[in-house]
Regions:
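Conserved catalytic-loop aspartate of Hanks-type protein kinases
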Residues: 189
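Conserved N-lobe beta3->alphaC-helix segment of eukaryotic protein kinase catalytic domains
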Residues: 31, 36-60
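A short, aromatic-enriched beta-strand patch in the conserved N-lobe beta-sheet
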Residues: 70-72
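Activation segment signature within eukaryotic-like protein kinase domains
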Residues: 114-115
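Conserved N-lobe ATP-binding subsite of Hanks-type protein kinase domains
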Residues: 19
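Conserved short submotifs of the Hanks-type protein kinase catalytic core
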Residues: 77-91, 95
Length: 369
């Protein structure tokens, strides 16, 4: 795989080390987002961060997390590239900017829809011992089906012991414990979500300062202007559970999703946001994180260490081919009758693909061989 396999479109964003573009994959003519990082410009630690993002993203599968498709090193451009799901709806930061220009506020229903999806994506990460560490409006994307996606896992870590120490994140969304340079846990992400929820209501962050030092002091104090009366007390209560200076008293993602307020909102929201994408998402699935990707001495060898590509269309084609092969192997009479244009369909007896896959993967084909 190389850059030549894609047609480059609009530039979505550019930083000091790389860029994100809309690309069209020639093989399936579908649009994706490609993050390209110039390896030559990165320090050793930054290279490992890029590989860590690939490692984590490729291990995840949830409707509220940006989907991974493939990663490759392009020898011509010397760039490490991650091909991801393209969210046509932009990000929450763009939505806020649009509302500021139009002098509009989001409806409360929209905000509840969004915050529930953010929390469900975050629960999936936390259940798998992953801290995002850079949750902000600009890192939350919206699909064409209006499904929210947590993205940019460059700073995410697997916290096996439940704590982290590295001071990182975006200042407006950093928790008091990070500002104090103290060890922090998953509750630090909750603070960030509280800042996001507040910003969706007020169209500005809860804490702002004339300088970085001033901002830090305000965050540590934890005092913010109340949310306007246009919104309900329920929103104010949920924000107050998140923006608690003491992380031990701050709500966890499970406590929030199981609160009476959100249980009621979730039951109403589900009626509106259920799509095929959500239905197939494995929300409670425990992920098998791939092993740490080690940086080889020769960068040309890095492609051998990267995870396999994952495109839905190709996976479905593989499944269909696999299904036909298994069906012909187990039940040749079905194939013969179908070849003879017999209209009789035996698939219902064996529950189609599920039955066949269940037995072939358990090794029962040896019995019949």
């Amino acid at each position: 795989m190389s850059m030549d396999d894609f047609i480059f479109g609009e530039l979505l964003g550019k930083g000091s080390f790389g860029s994100v573009n809309i690309v069209t994959r020639k093989q399936d003519n579908k649009q994706y987002a490609m993050k390209s990082v110039n390896i030559n410009n990165l320090k050793e630690k930054e290279k490992l961060c890029s590989l860590n993002e690939i490692r984590i993203l490729s291990s995840l599968n949830h409707p509220n997390i940006i989907g991974y498709h493939e990663a490759f090193f392009d020898t011509k451009t010397r760039t490490l590239n991650i091909v991801m799901e393209y969210a046509e709806g932009g990000d929450l930061h763009q939505k806020i900017k649009n509302n500021i220009k139009a002098h509009l506020h989001f409806t409360e229903k929209t905000i509840w829809d969004w915050i529930i999806q953010i929390l469900e994506g975050l629960k999936y990460l936390h259940d798998n011992k992953i801290m995002h560490r850079d949750l902000k409006c600009a890192n939350i994307f919206i699909s064409k089906d209006k499904i929210l996606k947590l993205g940019d896992l460059n700073l995410s870590i697997i916290a096996k012991k439940g704590m982290a120490k590295t001071k990182t994140g975006t200042p407006y969304y950093c928790s008091p414990e990070i500002w104090k340079d103290l060890p922090y846990d998953y509750k630090s992400d909750i603070w960030s979500v509280g800042c996001i929820l507040y910003e969706l209501c007020m169209l500005k962050p809860p804490f702002r300062g004339t300088s970085l030092k001033d901002l830090g002091l305000k965050v540590i104090k934890g005092k913010y202007s109340p949310v306007i009366k246009y919104y309900s007390d329920d929103i104010r209560k949920i924000i107050s559970k998140m923006l608690v200076v003491d992380p031990n008293k701050r709500a966890s993602v499970d406590e929030l999703l199981n609160s009476d307020i959100l249980i009621n909102k979730i039951s109403n929201t589900r009626k509106n946001i259920i799509t095929d994408e959500v239905k197939i998402g494995k929300k409670n699935e425990k992920v098998n994180l791939m092993e740490t990707i080690k940086l080889p001495r020769n960068l040309k060898d890095i492609n051998n260490k990267l995870p396999k590509k994952r495109y839905r269309v190709e996976n479905e084609m593989m499944e269909n081919d696999e299904y036909e092969t298994m069906k012909a192997f187990f039940f040749p009479e079905v194939k013969n009758q179908m070849n003879n244009n017999d209209n009789m369909n035996y698939d219902y007896i064996f529950n189609t693909k599920k039955f066949l896959k269940k037995y072939i993967y358990r090794g029962f084909y040896l019995i019949y061989k």
